[in-house]
């Protein structure tokens, strides 16, 4: 589901819907927290195990927090959220992560204004 939240986050950023983008970026992070907690054998419901995750992952999650509701900051947090999502997906299911990687990074690139040529 994280990729779907990423799609909505990217669309919200493009439309200038800052609070909505923040909502969807947080949704990406919620999916990362759930996956990481399950993988670590921690309570996943309502983020109850998040503070017990390894320090490096907690740091990565902190980087996904939106600090300001401007487009540049939303893109920064979105990029961090997608990177953290893919890193966790790699730990849980490398084959699925590989299938999602290109598409999800294209969402990030287009959120930053880069044009992805058709047919790629």
At which residue positions do the language-model features occur?
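Conserved nucleotidyltransferase catalytic core and NTase-mimicking acidic/glycine-rich helix/loop elements
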Residues: 1-120
């Amino acid at each position: 589901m994280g990729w779907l939240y990423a799609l909505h986050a990217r669309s919200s950023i493009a439309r200038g819907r800052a609070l909505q983008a923040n909502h969807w970026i947080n949704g990406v992070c919620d999916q990362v927290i759930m996956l990481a907690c399950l993988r670590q054998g921690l309570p996943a419901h309502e983020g109850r195990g998040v503070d017990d995750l390894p320090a490096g992952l907690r740091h990565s999650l902190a980087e996904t927090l939106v600090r300001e509701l401007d487009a540049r900051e939303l893109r920064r947090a979105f990029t961090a959220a997608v990177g953290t999502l893919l890193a966790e997906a790699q730990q849980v299911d490398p084959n699925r992560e590989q299938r999602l990687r290109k598409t999800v990074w294209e969402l990030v690139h287009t959120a930053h204004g880069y044009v992805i040529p058709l047919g790629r």
